[in-house]
């Protein structure tokens, strides 16, 4: 899969403005991502999601994140995530490797 250290840099540059990853981390514009893998869309406790996110009904794992992070608004039309996506597959792989580690510590 990807490189965790490179993924951490991508997270800091592109995601940390709106998301936290640590256990007990607060929600920002986007939800805290701790425990992301294996959780269904729209399920972080205490975060106000759009119906689109709540109703998508998929479980977050490597494959679903690869598709979502490429083009979030295409994958979940109606999401309030205003991020355009990451077109480079290797960057998505690195970010997912980092998320897999950081959201499970």
UniProtKB/Swiss-Prot annotation:
BP-aspect Gene Ontology terms: apoptotic process
Example of a GO MF term: metal ion binding
Residues bearing the modification N6-succinyllysine: 56, 73
Subcellular location: Mitochondrion intermembrane space
UniProt-listed InterPro entries: Cyt_c-like_dom, Cyt_c-like_dom_sf, Cyt_c_1A/1B
Pfam families named in the record: Cytochrom_C
PTM (free text): Binds 1 heme c group covalently per subunit.
Residues binding heme c: 15, 18-19, 81
SUPFAM superfamilies registered for this protein in UniProt: Cytochrome c
Main localization, broad class: mitochondrion
Keywords carried by this UniProt record: Acetylation, Apoptosis, Electron transport, Heme, Iron, Metal-binding, Mitochondrion, Phosphoprotein, Respiratory chain, Transport
An example Gene Ontology CC term for this record: mitochondrial intermembrane space
Residues where N6-acetyllysine is found: 73, 100
Modified residues (N-acetylglycine): 2
Gene3D superfamilies reported for this sequence: Cytochrome c-like domain
Superkingdom of the organism of origin: Eukaryota
Record-listed Phosphotyrosine modification sites: 49, 98
Misc remark: Mules and hinnies are heterozygous, having equal amount of horse and donkey cytochromes c.
Family assignment from sequence similarity: Belongs to the cytochrome c family.
Summary of the function given for this chain in its UniProt record: Electron carrier protein. The oxidized form of the cytochrome c heme group can accept an electron from the heme group of the cytochrome c1 subunit of cytochrome reductase. Cytochrome c then transfers this electron to the cytochrome oxidase complex, the final protein carrier in the mitochondrial electron-transport chain.
Name of protein: Cytochrome c
Gene this protein is translated from: CYCS
């Amino acid at each position: 899969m990807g490189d965790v250290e490179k993924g951490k840099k991508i997270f800091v540059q592109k995601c940390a403005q709106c998301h936290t990853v640590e256990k007990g981390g607060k929600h920002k514009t986007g939800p805290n991502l701790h425990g992301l893998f294996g959780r269904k869309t729209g399920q972080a406790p205490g975060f106000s999601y759009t119906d689109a996110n709540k109703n998508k009904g998929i479980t977050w794992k490597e494959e679903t994140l690869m598709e979502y992070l490429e083009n979030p608004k295409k994958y979940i039309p109606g999401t309030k995530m205003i991020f355009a996506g990451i077109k480079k597959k290797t960057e998505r792989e690195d970010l997912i490797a980092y998320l897999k580690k950081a959201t499970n510590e």
